[in-house]
């Protein structure tokens, strides 16, 4: 897949997907100082930069980028994240996005990785209660909002970003965060109101967004790193002051990446067979019998013509002394995917390896990519080919996929210009680390009177995690699952200053709540005391007329156990040492 402007399909660290990279020994200070010299601009370049900045402000641009390009051979994205966010600062909003792109013949390392920390602004929504924090202006306001997604959109309407040459074709700044599955309740207020939602046992935000002015973009093809700071002119008394402050902020960001005291990453060895499932997960939001009863109930609704399909999920719980960032480092090895993410948000940390976009808008083109239909990977290319044909000849899985393509066409069509919706690709097979999926691509041209936020509202949640018809399926999910889903099956990603959007579907995503618990344990055997974390691994199965309850329950177990292997690896590498 070609790199998209402001896409979050970004790349693994260099060196590729290893646990031990990033430890500098010996002449670390000298390395840092030499690297730092590459950030300097000569006098001519400084004058040119200042001239372009002031010209942009004179033309009415109120958000303007300043950037430096540095060598990246002394730094990895994982280490860069740790330079910006201390190990003990686990509630500081921040993110690391990476990617391995998939295709019919296997995997390719994505071109870009993106790191962000210290958002200038945050939006936190819980049901209809919204808190907006502007850290730059040191202000906070709380308000009731029928649709909190209109708030970031209204803020974006005030933006006039400067478009400059030299920025990479990746996400370079803007909103980053997550949208829970339950944000659908802002749209379907009558059929899916918050008042009728299942039990909210974790009290997580429904939306968390941070506005990131400081961004570090790794280009793994050109072997360089773009360090970017966006300047808000409205926060300063003059353009001159804005430029000088912006330069100082950029230099401060660079100095954190080039500090003499660069943090170290714990080295590790891969001791486990990462292709195997993780340890059995004993604790779930539903017992085996309760889940099987829910499958039977769903089939009754299908046979009655109430729905065609519904996705029933259950949330598994795993306790671990592995830190969430260690789990992310392990997940990069266990399950490299198009949307790798470590996202520290308010109330939780997301560790994700999603294979699928929720929605993408680039230059007003909407993209929806249904991913449904699964079979295991073969042990050889020849076996892969055999299994691929077996998957494409599976009538049940192909019928489900076509149904979801139709749902995708409907979602895109709601916000597209008449006649612009197309199925660009139909039923391609993509290979991932452990499985193969059937994939299709639906596109459309966004209507002139709408924005990317409307495309997100139309898509969320996608049919692959809800069912068909979508709203009726979600009503049944509320009745049968018993707990609010939270981030699972919602989306995470970014919306750029230019208005492009790339949101991944929150599948294969581990949720670590950060709120204190009365039963948290501690380990004092390590050099540093370790806190016990609760990891939530949620997985679902698509229920159709001929579904077998035992098989669907086992599918949930297998999906969650595959994700749990990352926790096993993190424990064996970082905790048990």
Swiss-Prot record:
It catalyses: chorismate + L-glutamine = anthranilate + pyruvate + L-glutamate + H(+). Its EC number is 4.1.3.27. Residues 1-34 form a transit peptide. InterPro entries: ADC_synthase, Anth_synth_I-like, Anth_synth_I_N, Anth_synth_I_PabB, Chorismate_C. Feedback inhibition by tryptophan. It is found in: Plastid, Chloroplast. It is an enzyme of class 4 (lyase). NCBIfam families: trpE_most. Heterotetramer consisting of two non-identical subunits: a beta subunit and a large alpha subunit. Belongs to the anthranilate synthase component I family. This is Anthranilate synthase alpha subunit 1, chloroplastic. The lineage of its organism: Eukaryota, Viridiplantae, Streptophyta, Embryophyta, Tracheophyta.
């Amino acid at each position: 897949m070609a790199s998209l402007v402001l896409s979050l399909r970004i790349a693994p660290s260099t060196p590729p997907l290893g646990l031990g990279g990033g430890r500098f020994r010996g002449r670390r200070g000298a390395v840092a100082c030499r690297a730092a010299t590459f950030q300097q601009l000569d006098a001519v370049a400084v004058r040119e930069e200042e001239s372009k900045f002031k010209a942009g402000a004179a033309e009415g641009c109120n958000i303007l980028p300043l950037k430096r390009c540095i060598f990246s051979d002394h730094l990895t994205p994982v280490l860069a994240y740790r330079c910006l966010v201390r190990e003990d600062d686990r509630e500081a909003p921040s993110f690391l996005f990476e990617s391995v792109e998939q295709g019919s013949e296997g995997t390719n390392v994505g071109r870009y990785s993106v790191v962000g920390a210290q958002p200038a602004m945050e939006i936190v929504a819980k049901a209809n209660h919204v808190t907006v924090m502007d850290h730059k202006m040191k202000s906070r306001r709380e308000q009731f909002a029928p649709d909190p997604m209109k708030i970031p959109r209204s803020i974006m309407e005030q933006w006039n970003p400067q478009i400059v040459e030299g920025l990479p074709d990746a996400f370079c700044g803007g909103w980053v965060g997550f949208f829970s599955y339950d944000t659908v309740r802002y749209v379907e207020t009558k059929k899916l109101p918050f008042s009728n939602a299942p039990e909210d046992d974790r009290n997580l935000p429904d939306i968390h967004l941070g506005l990131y002015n400081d961004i570090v973009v790794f280009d793994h093809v050109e072997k360089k790193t773009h360090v970017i700071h966006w300047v808000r002119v409205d926060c300063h008394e003059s353009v001159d002051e804005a430029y000088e402050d912006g330069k100082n902020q950029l230099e401060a960001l660079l100095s954190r990446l080039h500090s003499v005291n660069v943090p170290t990453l714990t080295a590790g060895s891969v001791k486990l067979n990462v292709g195997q499932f993780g340890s059995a997960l004993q604790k779930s939001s539903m017992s085996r019998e309760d889940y099987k009863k829910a499958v039977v109930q769903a089939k009754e609704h299908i046979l009655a013509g109430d729905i065609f399909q519904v996705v029933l999920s259950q949330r598994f719980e795993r306790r671990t002394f592995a830190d969430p960032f260690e789990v992310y480092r392990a997940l990069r090895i266990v399950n490299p995917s198009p949307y790798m993410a470590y996202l520290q948000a308010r109330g939780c940390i997301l560790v994700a390896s999603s294979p699928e976009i929720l929605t993408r808008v680039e230059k007003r083109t909407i993209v929806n990519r249904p991913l449904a239909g699964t079979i295991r990977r073969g042990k050889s290319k020849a076996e892969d080919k055999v299994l691929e044909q077996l998957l494409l000849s599976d009538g049940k899985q192909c019928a489900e996929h076509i149904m979801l393509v139709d749902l995708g066409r409907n979602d895109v069509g709601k916000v597209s210009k008449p006649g612009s919706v197309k199925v660009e690709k139909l039923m391609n097979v993509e290979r991932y680390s452990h499985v193969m999926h059937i994939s299709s691509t639906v596109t459309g041209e966004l209507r002139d009177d709408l924005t990317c936020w409307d495309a997100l509202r139309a898509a969320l949640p996608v049919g692959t995690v809800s069912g068909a018809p979508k709203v009726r399926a979600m009503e049944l999910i509320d009745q049968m699952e018993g707990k609010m889903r939270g981030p699972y099956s919602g989306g995470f990603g970014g919306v750029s200053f230019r208005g492009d959007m790339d949101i991944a579907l929150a599948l294969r995503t581990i949720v670590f709540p950060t709120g204190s618990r009365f039963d948290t344990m501690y380990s004092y055997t390590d050099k540093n005391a370790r806190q016990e974390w609760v990891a939530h691994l949620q997985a679902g199965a698509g229920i159709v007329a001929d579904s077998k309850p035992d098989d669907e329950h086992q599918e949930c177990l297998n999906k969650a156990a595959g994700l749990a292997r990352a926790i096993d690896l993190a424990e064996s590498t970082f905790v048990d040492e």
